[in-house]
């Protein structure tokens, strides 16, 4: 069940923006609004808190930034500089990752073509592929044998509890069969298992999937197969952002804002770490990988807008709008606008219409 908190609890976020007020205003004096601001400090804080929490509870842990969330060169390069690997979902994203100097790359998408796989194999020294299906396994296996190129791979799995997310990967019950099929291809080194679901407001997805996967491995894998499991990727989907929520509209009345009350990244890490110790440690010796996206880049970018016109005390026109984000996120979710020329710690009602 989703929990909500009061909008007053956004004050900590507002205070952080106000502390950076002079930097924003200096930029606005030099560059016409609207524009985007890359916040290196904000990104560093997110990376450091994420990595510290998970390494505290999972010593053999690696983090990979999900490039699809924001592929701006400054974001991607900084993730690499801070020691993260990169998770890519297309050849375009792979090229961005290579240009950023990434040495650790995971390539996963459910619709890889033969040409995609050939291109990835050229960079097999830096990239591991997470396979989505038996058909893809056979396609990649034949390509590696033909080209005589070795590459490390994993397979994405799902359980019935994953709902619509069962469109990705293979059923958990097919995992041993997949492992046996992969052994037919000498240039494929299958050593990883991958699962993911977005927007997990609680830890139950991770805890339950780890439990189910561990039980399956114990009951179905041979001792040699268990020894070959060197990596488990539990994806991302951490619902952490303190400013997110929903807009509740009732007729012509002012909308109500319900701010999501989410658990902390430390709580995610602790629960996942405890599940790994309980379920995986007795049967496999693996490295654990996660692919955070929004957690890393959410506070790394801001949009600076100006008021173009004031219609009345309740309505004004801005010189930019939701098109600057790329989708209608602000129509369904709540994010605070902070007045940096006349800052206040009190929230006020005003309709801010986009250009």
Question: What spans do the regions from the language model cover?
Answer:
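Active-site loop/helix belt of alpha/beta enzymes
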Residues: 2, 159-306
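Charged (often Lys/Glu-rich) extended helix/loop segments that serve as interaction or gating elements
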Residues: 48, 271-277, 281-355
């Amino acid at each position: 069940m989703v929990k909500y908190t009061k909008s007053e609890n956004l004050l900590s976020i507002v205070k952080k923006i106000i502390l950076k007020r002079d930097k924003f205003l200096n930029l606005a004096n030099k560059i016409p609004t609207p524009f985007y601001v890359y916040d290196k400090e904000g990104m560093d804080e997110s990376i450091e808190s994420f990595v510290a929490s998970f390494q505290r509870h999972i010593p053999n842990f690696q983090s990979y930034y999900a490039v699809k969330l924001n592929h701006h060169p400054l974001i991607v390069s900084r993730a690499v500089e801070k020691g993260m690997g990169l998770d890519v979902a297309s050849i375009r994203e792979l090229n961005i990752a290579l240009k950023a100097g990434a040495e650790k790359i995971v390539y996963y998408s459910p619709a890889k073509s033969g040409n995609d796989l050939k291109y990835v194999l050229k960079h097999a020294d830096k990239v591991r592929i997470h396979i989505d299906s038996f058909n893809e396994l056979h396609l990649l296996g034949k390509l590696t044998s033909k080209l005589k190129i070795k590459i490390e791979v994993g397979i994405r799995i799902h359980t019935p509890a994953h709902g619509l997310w069962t469109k990705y990967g293979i059923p958990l019950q097919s995992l041993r069969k997949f492992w046996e099929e992969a052994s037919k291809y000498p240039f494929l080194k299958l050593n990883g298992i991958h699962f993911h679901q977005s927007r997990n407001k609680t830890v139950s997805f991770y805890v339950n999937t780890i439990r189910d996967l561990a039980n399956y491995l114990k009951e179905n894998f041979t001792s040699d197969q268990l020894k070959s499991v060197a990596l488990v990727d539990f994806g991302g989907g951490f619902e952490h952002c303190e400013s997110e929520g929903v807009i509740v509209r009732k007729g012509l009345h002012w909308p109500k804002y319900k701010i999501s009350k989410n658990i902390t990244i430390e709580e995610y890490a602790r629960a996942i770490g405890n599940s790994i110790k309980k379920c995986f440690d007795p049967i496999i010796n693996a490295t654990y990988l996660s692919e955070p996206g929004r957690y890393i880049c959410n506070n790394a970018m801001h949009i600076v807008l100006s008021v173009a016109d004031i219609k009345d005390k309740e309505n004004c026109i801005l010189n930019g709008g939701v098109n600057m984000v790329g989708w209608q996120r602000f129509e369904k979710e709540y994010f605070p606008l902070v007045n940096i020329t006349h800052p206040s710690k009190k929230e006020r009602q005003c309709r801010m219409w986009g250009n």
